[in-house]
Swiss-Prot record:
NCBIfam families: L12. Homodimer. Part of the ribosomal stalk of the 50S ribosomal subunit. Forms a multimeric L10(L12)X complex, where L10 forms an elongated spine to which 2 to 4 L12 dimers bind in a sequential fashion. Binds GTP-bound translation factors. GO terms for cellular component: cytosolic large ribosomal subunit. GO terms for biological process: translation. The keyword Ribosomal protein applies. Keywords: Ribonucleoprotein, Ribosomal protein. This is Large ribosomal subunit protein bL12. PANTHER family: 39S RIBOSOMAL PROTEIN L12, LARGE RIBOSOMAL SUBUNIT PROTEIN BL12M.
């Protein structure tokens, strides 16, 4: 049996593609999902909390548009996914592309994708 340190070291040496496959295998084996939990917020207290600016944004690929190949290339560049994974993501829109990113990064990603004809939502 491997120690926690050995497991961490093995994960540190994996490629992005290998890590993606590992996550999928863990999801299937244990019946869980690696998606970030969604917090349901209650009503804002006297509107004070609603005025606070959101600091983390999710970038959602809503539609790939007519130039799917260009969109797949940009998705690969942004996410580091392999060709098959990027194609699957683009073919099955709407899908989250990046989660919990800064406003600047979200706007940059949105601009890159819209430049090649994709429809993108920032939430």
């Amino acid at each position: 049996m491997m120690t926690k340190e050995q497991i961490i070291e093995a994960v540190k040496n994996m490629t992005v593609l290998e890590l993606n496959e590992l996550v999928k295998a863990i999801e299937e084996e244990f019946g869980v999902t690696a998606a970030a939990p969604v917090v349901v917020a209650g009503g804002a207290a006297a509107g004070g909390e609603a005025a606070a600016e959101k600091t983390e944004f999710d970038v959602i690929l809503a539609d790939a548009g007519a130039q799917k190949i260009k969109v797949i290339k940009v998705v690969r560049e942004i996410t580091g996914l392999g060709l098959k994974e990027a194609k699957d993501l683009v073919d099955n829109t709407p899908k989250p592309l990046k989660e919990a990113v800064s406003k600047e990064e979200a706007e940059e990603i949105k601009a890159k994708l819209e430049e090649v004809g994709a429809k993108v939502e920032v939430k």
